[in-house]
């Protein structure tokens, strides 16, 4: 169990992609065909059944399926290549959306990528669910669109979301990976805008290493939800139950909650090259496995993906299937000592 949840194999391997990521293709779980199973939780259930046989009066607290919908807000302005803007006209026959992107600043309108943030929260509320929005505050780079949370049109959106009780978190930029100083600066700036002292979030591009837990702990963050593979959906940590990680290098528990990421829209569409219908089927299978072990189904869907008519529709289909499933409450889990 510790082998899976501590990501021991990633400490032992130097294999990484161009972004410094350990991929599913390199993992024991995918090579031996059990990445699709929460194997740590399954072992736990088997052990529970043995104990119940030995101690008939013993019953552990019941765990039920919960959902963690999260959204990395990578972009808030005009799409970098205009593909999405033109898509509004060609695919959806919505020329106004194209004008919104191209002329929005002059007309005082929010760009479609920023407007999609409100669509995300609206969809969640309509289905009795809750969403967490993870924001950046970084300069433009080869791998970051770059935006400033203090910009008036962005800050107004963030303030409105906070007033509506939407969870806001951090999405540290590409180059904060393995750079504690830069990470700390960004986290501090974002939390200042949020007027929050402790939040959670996810690293941009899923750039993660077991030592990333150390950096996040030092920055005072409450939880991380980066531990998922970019190239394949599944159970990277072998579990869908949030947990406090154990650092094999420091030989101690990390003061941080890990909420394992199970699936991401980009993984399905780009890395696995699945059609929207196939993506929905795979996501619901994953959610069902979480339900069996009483875990948390953690899904990442970017605001940009809602602008794609096919994947926007696929996301709504998943929400319909998950309708009124309780959200995972990380604050309650930490305060109660459940994790």
Indicate where each model-derived feature is located.
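A local structural micro-motif
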Residues: 131-132, 169, 199, 222-226, ...
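Catalytic domains of cell-wall/extracellular-matrix polysaccharide-remodeling enzymes
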Residues: 174-252, 308-312
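A generic structural signal for nonpolar/compact residues at packed positions
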Residues: 72, 170-172, 216, 299
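Terminal accessory/targeting
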Residues: 1-149, 241, 248-339
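Metal-dependent polysaccharide deacetylase catalytic core of the NodB/CE4 family, i.e.
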Residues: 75, 79, 100-101, 118-208, ...
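Aromatic-residue detector
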Residues: 23, 72, 133-134, 158-163, ...
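Alpha-helical structural signal in soluble globular domains
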Residues: 123, 160, 164, 189, ...
């Amino acid at each position: 169990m510790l082998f899976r949840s501590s990501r021991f194999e990633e400490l032992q391997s130097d294999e990484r992609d161009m972004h410094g990521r350990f991929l599913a293709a390199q993992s024991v779980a995918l090579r031996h065909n059990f990445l699709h199973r929460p194997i740590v939780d399954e072992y736990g259930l088997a052990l529970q059944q043995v104990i119940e046989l030995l101690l008939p009066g013993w019953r552990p607290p019941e765990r039920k399926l919960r959902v963690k919908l999260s959204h990395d807000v990578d972009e808030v302005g005009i799409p970098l290549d205009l593909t999405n803007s033109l898509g509004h006209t060609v695919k959806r026959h919505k020329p106004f959306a194209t004008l919104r992107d191209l002329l929005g600043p002059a007309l005082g309108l929010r760009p479609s990528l920023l407007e999609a943030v409100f669509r995300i929260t609206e969809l969640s509320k309509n289905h009795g669910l809750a969403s967490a929005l993870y924001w950046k505050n970084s300069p433009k780079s080869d791998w970051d669109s770059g935006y400033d949370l203090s910009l008036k049109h962005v800050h107004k959106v963030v303030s409105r979301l906070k007033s509506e009780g939407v969870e806001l978190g951090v999405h540290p930029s590409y180059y904060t990976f393995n750079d504690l100083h830069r990470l700390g600066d960004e986290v501090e700036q974002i939390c200042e805008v949020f007027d929050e002292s402790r939040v959670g979030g996810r690293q941009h591009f899923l750039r993660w290493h077991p030592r990333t837990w150390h950096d996040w702990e030092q920055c005072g963050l409450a939880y991380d939800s980066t531990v998922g593979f970019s190239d394949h959906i599944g159970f990277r940590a072998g579990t869908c139950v949030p947990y406090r990680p154990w650092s094999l290098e420091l030989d101690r528990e990390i003061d941080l909650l890990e909420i394992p990421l199970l699936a991401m829209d980009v993984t399905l569409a780009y890395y696995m090259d699945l059609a929207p219908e196939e993506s929905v089927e795979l996501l619901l299978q994953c959610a069902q496995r979480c339900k069996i072990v009483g875990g948390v189904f953690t899904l990442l869907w970017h605001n940009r993906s809602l602008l794609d008519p096919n994947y926007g529709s696929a996301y709504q289909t998943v929400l319909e299937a998950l309708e009124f499933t309780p959200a995972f409450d990380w604050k309650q889990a930490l305060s109660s000592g459940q994790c």
